[in-house]
Amino acid sequence: MDATRSVYLIDTENQHDWWVGNIKSNTANDKVVLFYSVNSPPVHYELIEKLLMTFSVRQLEFVETYPGKNSQDFFIMNRLGQMIAKAPKSKYIVISEDKGYDPLLWSLTQKGYKAYRHCYKAT
């Protein structure tokens, strides 16, 4: 049985780099989408280097978002909707401390999609 593809949508405005060592690539089709803006902490070379130990370059996507109240959240939810429309059987994990995602993600799980939020704390 094939492993389910996992897609990680990273809210860098509030998750910084705490998630880096906690996500894993289970299939060659897994994907990491990093959303960043001027409000995000800088993405350092060391972070990219750690990512490349687990994910290939083709598994990584960087999405610049525009500043504004909840702007990055809306970009993430928009991209999630686009991805679910193309690959409804994939597992989607929003990495964020922001609980504002939860009602939409709950609604998606009620419709049979695998869509969750997880957050990591500084160690």
In which residue ranges do the predicted regions lie?
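Short, conserved loop/helix-junction motifs that constitute active-site signature segments
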Residues: 24-29
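Nuclease catalytic cores that cleave nucleic-acid phosphodiester bonds
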Residues: 35-123
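Extreme N-terminal starter segment of soluble prokaryotic enzymes
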Residues: 2-7
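Generic enzyme active-site microenvironment
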Residues: 9-11, 96
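Short linear S-[DN]-x-LW-Φ motif typified by the pepsin-like aspartic protease active-site region
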Residues: 31-33
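Enriched - but not universal
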Residues: 21-22, 109
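Short acidic, Gly/Ser-rich segments with clustered Asp/Glu that frequently serve as metal-coordination loops
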Residues: 12-20
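Short, glycine/acidic-enriched capping/hinge loops at junctions between secondary-structure elements
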Residues: 19-21, 45-46
